[in-house]
Amino acid sequence: MASGKATGKTDAPAPVIKLGGPKPPKVGSSGSVSWFQAIKAKKLNSPQPKFEGSGVPDNENLKTSQQHGYWRRQARFKSSRGGRKPVPDAWYFYYTGTGPAADLQWGDSQAGIVWVAAKGADVKSKSNQGTRDPDKFDQYPLRFSDGGPDGNFRWDFIPLNRGRSGRSTAVSSAASSRAPSREGSRGRRSGAEDDLIARAAKIIQDQQKKGSRITKAKAEEMAHRRYCKRTVPPGYKVEQVFGPRTKGKEGNFGDDKMNEEGIKDGRVTAMLNLVPSSHACLFASKLTPKLQPDGLHLKFEFTTVVPRDDPQFDNYVSICDQCVDGVGTRPKDDEPRPKSRASSRPATRGNSPAPRQQRLKKEKKPKKQDDEVDKALTSDEERNNAQLEFDDEPKVINWGDSALGENEL
């Protein structure tokens, strides 16, 4: 989207949303979809969303009186062999007087519509904010400074400065989290924007108290970042991230079981309770810097004291006995069982090593569909689905009770 310097006064409409791209979108856009990314129901047939705050996405370019609109339900489907399969609904935000329900007054009752307004908004007025042209602009990430939707809904947290190459960076794309190699915009963020991101991230973290989820791309990044900042992602062996276990030198913690299971081993979670935080390591350690041919080596010496009256004292002692210089060993209760000896009885029909003859399974014929149109999506549904980001659940790894401190990610 080319940008140019203004030469005097102009009758062109003012920009609506300050999004950090070369030129923000203008009022009266010819698009037909929401400016914002969707919130998505976690289950089929979820009730309509309720919000902790006003329910209006943050937009610093609008006056308080203009902060009102509606959330509209969007039914979603996936193509499958047997036809089309419904998936949980998505809900999109539109300002009053725009979008599919542009002819409604604020508060008019209609199925699949939830009206929202900020305190002090003039709901009798209609907005001239227009809608988005998806061929020109990406979706704008959702931010709720006063509280987001209830726990029946989710949305993906996207940094405001993340954009897509080859298209306008006026709006950060929800799809960018599926491609971490895409370059983010290099514009500076204001302190207020950083604070807003922190608040939004906290809201999402609060909604996901039952357990965080990490994508495969994020896990790969965790395992290959700078060595001193690495963490062991789910499904990884310790040696994949920090190298083979040793004895008597650095890397001497972990027996064979811990190395194989990584953070699944409960002993990891236990011992991480004793590991110093970054600040403790920096300010409470004995730090010894040493210049070497390959660079500056920093040695941190820190002592954690576990009182003898600690309820877990014996467990910590046991874990240290097992895992310090533990390479080549396993816990006693995890020793592999010896294989049972082969039977010396003569082979009979019952115990013969020859495989039994299997019955041939009948091939299932695909069911005929009375309505062939039902097998494919309609053109409207194809267009709607094309607008949706993160339709499918991303390939994620259940993190469970995190073995990492909140400052480690």
Curated annotation (Swiss-Prot):
Which protein is depicted? Nucleoprotein
Principal localization? virion
Tell me the segments the record calls region Disordered. 1-31, 46-83, 121-149, 164-193, 327-409
Per UniProt, the ranges with Low complexity bias are 15-31, 164-179
Name its species. Turkey coronavirus (strain Indiana) (TCoV)
Q: List the disulfide bonds.
A: 320-323
> Which PROSITE patterns does the record associate with it?
COV_N_CTD (PS51929), COV_N_NTD (PS51928)
Report the residue ranges that make up the CoV N CTD domain in this protein. Answer: 215-331
